[in-house]
């Protein structure tokens, strides 16, 4: 099996708040705005907004009512620590940083190189969505040929 992710669903506190942010973010990450869908899954008590890309579907979902007031924290068991998207170049990371500020993302760390990360040349920007969910856009140099 090839390690390829088909889709990701992230639960947000309030779709009405999150959806406008993700409507601006997802095209910056290569998702086509016209490839967006919405559904109510009554059997599982949630609504979902899904952004399509030929290689990955990314969705935001409403919380169950019983969990709606729970705090979001990436270090809780079962939580997503952060999600990283791969950029084609450092310039792409830098350009995205400007756009992230424009759409109101909370910048955690502006673009910079991380010599403590693997592989050498790791260059990334970290940011959060309106719920405080942490994301990264990273560029790493192509692997050296063996």
PLM-predicted stretches and their roles:
Residues 9-58:
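Core segments of cupin and vicinal oxygen chelate
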Residues 127-144:
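Short, contiguous alpha-helical
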Residues 44-88, 95:
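Long, continuous compositionally biased terminal/linker segments
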Residues 1-19, 30, 83, 141-146:
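N-terminal beta-strand motif that seeds the catalytic metal site of vicinal oxygen chelate
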Residues 2-4, 76-80, 119:
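Short glycine-enriched loop/turn motifs at secondary-structure junctions
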Residues 12-17, 83-123, 128-130:
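Vicinal oxygen chelate
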């Amino acid at each position: 099996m090839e390690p390829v992710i088909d889709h990701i669903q992230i639960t947000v506190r309030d779709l009405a708040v999150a959806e406008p942010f993700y409507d601006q973010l997802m095209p910056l990450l290569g998702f086509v705005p016209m490839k967006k869908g919405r559904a109510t899954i009554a059997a599982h008590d949630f609504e979902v907004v899904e952004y399509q890309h030929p290689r990955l579907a990314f969705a935001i979902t409403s919380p169950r009512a019983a969990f709606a007031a729970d705090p979001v924290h990436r270090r809780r068991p079962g939580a997503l620590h952060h999600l990283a998207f791969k950029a084609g170049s450092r310039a792409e990371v830098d350009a995205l940083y400007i756009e992230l500020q424009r759409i109101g993302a909370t910048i955690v760390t502006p673009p910079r190189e991380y010599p403590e990360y693997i592989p050498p040349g790791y260059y990334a920007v970290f940011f959060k969505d309106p719920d405080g969910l942490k994301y990264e856009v990273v560029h790493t140099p192509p692997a050296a040929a063996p």
